[in-house]
Amino acid sequence: MSKSSRKSSGQSAAAPSDFQEHLQRLEERGLLVRVDWPINKDTEIHPLMRWQFVGGYLEDQRKAMMFTNVVGSGGEKYDIPVVVGALAATHEIYAMGMGVGVDKLADVWMRAIDHPIEPIYVDNAPCHEVVITGDDLTKPGGGLALLPVPISTPGFDAAPYLTATVCVTKDPETGVRNMGTYRAGLKANDRLGVRMASRLSGAGGYLHWQKYKKLGQPMPCAIVVGCAPVVVFTGPQKLAIDQDEMAVAGGLAGRPMRVTRAKTVDLEIPADAEIVVEGLIDTDL
């Protein structure tokens, strides 16, 4: 597991180059609310956010929310904030992730799909500033237990879930990358359960899994949390199965996105990601 420890440079661009820059822009526009008192990730975060949608708020009254003092039901305290609603709580927030007006969204998507821009590779990426491997993943309170993963639907979900993910896999036959948005349930300090069969024919990651299963090999996967909105937006988009979402993200931004090599699996990942969880998905089922 690796993560970035940097702060936003505040660099101005048409589309935010990373998640920190996006949050800074939202805050400057009054679209991000910071909650600094203790908030329980298991029982309070998502009910507070959902209240904006079911409690009578108009869309232009909704805000993204950053919880900076996160605790768990077992007495856990976390030094990582949780951000909710910062990608698509409103049309305006979504459009700000692309650096365009709401009226330009459809045009920008069509341009990006028709004219993708290939990513560029970089070394010494921000996402590798902090790397956690080996025994540090399985010790008490280590690994995934360091992350304040919330319960999305208290009373219904069987586990805390990462939701706004970018799950990176690669076709073992063609080498084509896929980036999908799949919920990842926390099972242990070093284990997540990821559901990739999210469409009738199988999502891109699931089709890759089927190929690895035929090869009798586990599937390398990198789960990205917190990166440039244009990268996240490609995950749930229904693109051609052999189209590289990272290139489409470049088309959305109007410039190449930065990628780097993962530390433990043969995949390229967003270089400016906040958190990357690397691992293998078992195919011996």
Q: Where are these predicted regions, by residue range?
A:
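Extended, highly charged
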Residues: 2-285
